[in-house]
């Protein structure tokens, strides 16, 4: 009897060891399946947003528990771009911190492909395919191993990282929820086919910020063509406020040459800071407007919110999936918070004598129930008698309900005999203003029956004579 019990005990121990060894072999096999993945996946914490202290290792389930991955929350995967130094840029911990501030229970993973990103640009651009494959295999493993829903996954890629995110999204077993492209790189990608770059098919929703598209297609730092469901071009997508040459000279004079590299990529990196702004200032999202071109936007012709023609920039964007990519525009401030308030102004210039002037400088001042914004400069390429002109202006402060405006026609910076002999002028009865953010239209009337606007003279004053509030479905 005793020998039988010992035999059963020995059999149990043998079976247990066999099961354990098989489990170990299976785990080892799974690790080998991912041994060629070079990218690293660091789960950063709200307490330490700057350091990669814990890595999620594909094929090693214990690493997910060790890093305290939250299986019931959203996951953000931040993918950096090309690097000269081989180190993370200063924006990475800022974005991580902003994501955790907005979504405290989320997982923020930083994808480290620094060794590949530090090569000559064409080489690093080619590596985006391998990085995308690495990210896709990691995501697929998380879904298969832990049944983690891909509807909780949001990829954020900057520059080359945006295309790596797109390639990853195209290779996952199921579509991830969202990809945000932060000024996707232009060189090597402007004319690339969709499978080799970020495209609308790579996620349930793809939104893109274009902030440095200056130059000919294929040569601009950021990609020019739309590559998402919604493509937003702040300030036309070329240069960003505060990133101009004059600003560069001023900063170099104040801080020395150490910040030159920051100024070179200032507009490119602005895409990241605009997104960070949307995370931190959720109560006041910047509004972008769909438009056929930046020239039409500059004329104020696109401040409509009908049929999804306007949208929020950044995290709280409305996920509109149109058949064609939607190009949207907005103005911003030069620093955070970036939000401004857009207005379309329409003026009819009347007169008894035919006059035409080119490149005329004006100033307009707006006065509202909350604040005022004075001496806003604008230039009209042409001003002719008995013609109506539309243009865009914006204020950096919310002035509330519009009550009054002043319009001044500025003198030329050079001496003009014709202006000295007889000051040019136009008659203006009404000025129409539409506020983009509130969608309200206001008509301003001259304090007299007609205001006579003369070049270089006192501004003409107009007060609200009629307004018409419009809801979001109106024009």
From Swiss-Prot:
Residues noted as binding Ca(2+) in the record, renumbered to the chain: 194, 197, 199, 202
Transmembrane segments: none
Gene Ontology MF, one: phospholipase A1 activity
Ranges of residues in domain PLAT: 341-464
UniProt main location, coarse: membrane
Residue ranges of the region described as Essential for determining substrate specificity: 243-266
Glycosylation site positions: 70, 386
Family matches, as InterPro entries: AB_hydrolase_fold, Lipase, Lipase_LIPH, Lipase_N, Lipo_Lipase, PLAT/LH2_dom, PLAT/LH2_dom_sf, TAG_lipase
Disulfides per UniProt: 54-67, 243-266, 291-310, 302-305, 445-465
Assembly, per entry: Homodimer. Interacts with GPIHBP1 with 1:1 stoichiometry. Interacts with APOC2; the interaction activates LPL activity in the presence of lipids. Interaction with heparan sulfate proteoglycans is required to protect LPL against loss of activity. Associates with lipoprotein particles in blood plasma. Interacts with LMF1 and SEL1L; interaction with SEL1L is required to prevent aggregation of newly synthesized LPL in the endoplasmic reticulum (ER), and for normal export of LPL from the ER to the extracellular space.
UniProt name for this protein: Lipoprotein lipase
Native organism: Papio anubis (Olive baboon)
Phylogenetic classification of the source organism: Eukaryota, Metazoa, Chordata, Craniata, Vertebrata
